[in-house]
A protein has these predicted regions:
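Beta-rich nucleic-acid/ligand-interaction surfaces
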Residues: 51, 130-131, 170-174
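Aromatic-enriched alpha-helical interface/lid elements that frame and gate functional surfaces
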Residues: 81-158, 162
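Conserved PLP cofactor-binding pocket of PLP-dependent enzymes
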Residues: 156-176
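Residues in well-ordered alpha-helical elements
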Residues: 18, 105, 149, 168-169
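Active-site-adjacent "lid/gating" segments in soluble enzymes
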Residues: 1-93, 97
């Protein structure tokens, strides 16, 4: 990838499922240890590391010569609410609205685009997917009006699921 390549869109649960397996194994092992020794254990896992582990299958496949189809550009994504967008400060955020019908009015309000809720082009999930190219353009124009920190407050404050594409400057303050 070059500097102009945007990140791949992730699938739901890409890190959550491996974390669940890691925690299951850690908890069962800790309980077994306690049963045998009478001593407890501290268990932990890491969403980021487990997400990387989950994606490692693709990396391994590539190492042995697998061929992958061309990735659809983000501007042509099939679903605008599970896509990434650039903020005013150049940072990228990734929307991940999996309960789209319920969250659509909230997202529209957060974007200051209440008009989208009643726009017949975007009335249903099916409509939004059919008009995803237009919706992506609208989102692009909207997200670029505020810095990432502002969008974080707005989206977090309204319970919308999103992620931030990390950069090296984030490492010292990353909670993971």
């Amino acid at each position: 990838a070059d500097e102009h390549t945007t990140p791949a869109r992730s699938i739901a649960g890409m890190g959550d499922h491996p974390c669940a397996m890691a925690f299951y194994g850690a908890i069962v092992t800790a309980l077994y240890k306690r049963e045998r020794t009478g001593k407890g254990s501290h268990v932990s896992s890491n969403l980021m590391a487990n997400g990387v582990w989950a994606a490692s299958v693709l990396a391994q496949a590539k190492l042995v010569g697998a061929k992958f189809g061309e990735r659809r550009p983000r501007e042509r994504a099939l679903n605008a609410v599970t896509n990434h967008y650039q903020c005013k400060d150049g940072r990228l955020l990734i929307l991940s609205l999996l309960n789209e019908d319920r969250q659509w009015p909230t997202l529209s309000r957060c974007l200051g685009r209440e008009d989208l809720v009643t726009d017949v082009r975007f009335e249903t999930k099916k409509d939004r997917h059919a008009q995803s190219l237009e919706l992506i353009k609208i989102f692009d124009e909207t997200f670029v009006t505020r810095d990432l920190a502002e969008w974080r407050k707005i989206l977090d404050g309204n319970g919308l699921v999103f992620g931030v594409v990390g950069i090296l400057d984030d490492i010292p303050t990353d909670q993971q």
